[in-house]
Structure formats: structure tokens, C-alpha cells
Design a protein with these regions (language model features):
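FKBP-type peptidyl-prolyl cis-trans isomerases
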Residues: 1-366
Length: 366
């Protein structure tokens, strides 16, 4: 390791909220090794009269910005190389970008650095986490009623109604006509798909409503199990995890708004809110989601739960068809996380050996 001795000299201090502070001094000669690259980088971005951008000579750039600015850039380049070795040597499981402060900077002198980094937090699960589901019963889903079946059929009839027709004179006279509903016959049932008769159609509708009620009951039980688990799990959630969840929420929200034919800026104007205001509205929800994900990660790690490769491959194939421009490596990680979450949640629900789970293609298993 190039910086092993220097890294050993840096002091490590644990901070609240899953952060650490690393402090130390960097010899001037180490920083000086980066000054030429720093000056070249600065010169390449300067926009000065008489020169094309990217073609400013380094001596002209130095006179323009001054030695201290070059030194600051050199420190930044040095830290990019030094930081990965530092966290590896200190055995820090850092997440996100560190906050780097220069507390002493002068030509020819050692540079003093203070680095604050978020670290992957310690997650303490409740001792009885495997037993939580036993205290939360699955509420019995009621079968579909005749009225619910009738409402569904009425909706089907209305969706296939024949639009009313009026002559121009009738329109001028203010006449109104109602859409003509088709009759509920075996022929109508057959037109909807593989239904031989009205009775078969009603039978399938009744079955579908019943299955939906069962899914709703299962979802409600899962939500209660999650709520109980997260409430008893102890973890200091780093801000970077909350911000990451907020980014996901905002991205989904922007997609939803766009789908309805409105720009996000117009949505903000109509809502009399700023983007930061909307983020703050969802901050509590994002914190809960972040805590849940950390909790699921801990269980998956302890129990050695992994997504099955064939399930991941199948989901990748589906996702690529819909998002061909996506980063394939990141997409695979995302799918693996979603499927691992689903397996973990099924185990939480009492399923000892979940097989071949599938995502809902919406990106969140929770």
C-alpha cells in the first residue's frame, strides 16, 4: 500500500449517528507530487480572454488563480488516492462521500485534514425476530359477495357501451342521449375472452375478487410484521441512507407525474411547493424505508439469504426489455436486492424455504 505508513498515523474517532472522524497531517512533499496535475486540471477549465477553454498555459493559470488554489486542488487529488487506502487500513465500512475539511494549508508545510465519513451502522435485531410472525395472525379473507360481482360486471358493461349518436339538429335542440349498454349474454361473455357463458364469467370474477382479498390480507399481515420488527430493531441510520431513499421516492414521484402528462416543475407550481419542501414531506417515510432496508440486510447476512441466480436472470431479461439503456451492473444489483428482500420477508412471515420469488417490477420489495 502506497500510503500505509501515513494512514497508520491518522487518528480515528467514532461519532454519533454512525459516523467516524479521521484526522491527521500529510507531509508537504506528498502533496507537492500532485501540484503539476492540479495546475494542469485548473488550466484546462479556465476561461480567459485570448485563450480557448482548455488551452490556457499553466504559467498563466498559476498567475491567475494563485499558489493556494493550486495547493487546494492538489490536496483534493491526493485525497482521492489516499482515502480508499485509509478506510481499508482502518477497517472502516464507509458509505457515501466523505466530508473532507482542510484545517491547515500553507506552501511548504504539512496539510492538516479532518475527514468525516458515514459508516455502515451496527444493526441490533430483536432476539425474538423469528417469532414475531407467530403473534400476528392472517385475517381470514371474506369471499366475494354477489354485490361485488355485480359491480364488476356493471363496470365491464359500461366499458363496452356504444357511444350515443345525435343528429346535428338534436344537438342544437339540447337533446341528450345515454350510451347504449350491451346486454349481459353468453355472447357478451365470450367476447371478453375464454368464457363460455355468463355463469362462467361470474365464476371467474368471483374467484378474482376472492384472490385479491387474500392478497390484501397477506399484505396487511406483512405490514404488521415489518412494523413490529423495525420498531424493535436498534440502528443509527446514517443520513446518506435516508437521502438515498429520498432520491428513490422523488424519482418515482417525477415518473408518476410525467405519466399523467405534467412536468414536475408544473406540479410544484400547482402544489405551491419547492422540490426541497417535497423532499422534507417524505423524509420520515424515507427514514423508515432506510431502517427497514438495513434491517433486512442484517437478517439476510446473518441467515445467508441470497437471490437465486435463475430468478435474477429472469428478472434481468424482463427489465432489459423495458429499460434497454439502463446500467446493467447497477440494474443487476438492484434486482438482486429486491429479490433478496422478498425472500427475507417471506422467511419473516414463517416460510422456512422460499423458492423462486419474483419482484413486482416496480423496484421495491417493501
Amino acid at each position: 500500500m502506497k500510503f500505509e505508513e501515513l494512514a497508520k498515523a491518522f487518528a480515528l474517532k467514532e461519532l454519533p449517528e454512525s459516523e467516524v472522524e479521521i484526522t491527521g497531517d500529510v507531509p508537504a512533499d506528498m502533496i507537492n507530487e500532485y501540484k503539476d496535475a492540479a495546475l494542469t486540471h485548473i488550466a484546462g477549465e479556465l476561461d480567459l480572454p485570448g485563450f480557448r477553454v482548455g488551452h490556457v498555459p499553466t504559467d498563466v493559470a498559476l498567475k491567475k488563480v494563485g499558489e493556494l488554489t493550486v495547493l487546494e486542488e492538489a490536496v483534493e487529488l491526493f485525497v482521492k488516492d489516499f482515502y480508499p487506502e485509509l478506510v481499508e487500513l482502518k477497517k472502516i465500512e464507509a458509505v457515501g462521500r466523505p466530508d473532507i475539511r482542510i484545517t491547515k494549508l500553507a506552501p511548504g508545510q504539512a496539510v492538516s485534514l479532518v475527514i468525516v465519513a458515514a459508516v455502515y451502522p451496527v444493526v441490533t435485531l430483536p432476539k425474538n425476530w423469528k417469532e414475531i410472525e407467530k403473534g400476528i395472525a392472517l385475517e381470514e379473507a371474506q369471499p366475494a359477495t354477489d354485490e361485488e360481482v355485480k359491480q364488476t360486471i356493471d363496470s365491464l358493461l359500461k366499458s363496452r357501451a356504444v357511444p350515443p349518436t345525435l343528429t346535428e339538429d338534436e344537438v342544437k335542440e339540447g337533446k341528450k342521449a345515454e350510451a347504449i349498454l350491451p346486454e349481459l349474454t353468453d355472447e357478451f361473455a365470450k367476447s371478453l375472452g375464454a368464457f363460455e357463458s355468463v355463469d362462467k364469467l361470474k365464476e371467474q370474477i368471483k374467484k378474482g375478487i376472492g384472490e385479491e382479498k387474500q392478497r390484501t390480507a397477506k399484505d396487511a399481515r406483512r405490514a404488521k410484521i415489518i412494523e413490529a420488527l423495525v420498531a424493535e430493531t436498534v440502528v443509527a441510520v446514517p443520513a446518506v441512507f435516508v437521502e438515498s431513499e429520498l432520491d428513490k421516492i422523488m424519482s418515482q414521484m417525477q415518473e408518476d407525474v410525467t405519466r399523467f402528462g405534467m412536468s414536475f416543475d408544473d406540479y410544484l407550481k400547482q402544489s405551491s411547493k419547492t422540490e426541497e419542501g417535497v423532499r422534507n414531506d417524505f423524509r420520515e417515510q424515507a427514514a423508515k424505508r432506510a431502517k427497514l432496508q438495513l434491517t433486512l440486510n442484517k437478517i439476510a447476512s446473518d441467515e445467508k439469504i441470497e437471490a437465486d441466480k435463475e430468478d435474477v436472470d429472469a428478472e434481468m431479461k424482463h427489465a432489459i426489455e423495458h429499460f434497454p439503456e439502463a446500467n446493467m451492473a447497477l440494474l443487476r444489483i438492484h434486482i438482486e436486492t429486491v429479490l433478496r428482500n422478498e425472500k427475507t420477508l417471506q422467511i419473516l412471515e414463517g416460510n422456512k424455504d422460499p423458492k423462486h420469488v419474483a419482484s413486482n417490477h416496480e423496484g421495491h420489495a417493501h
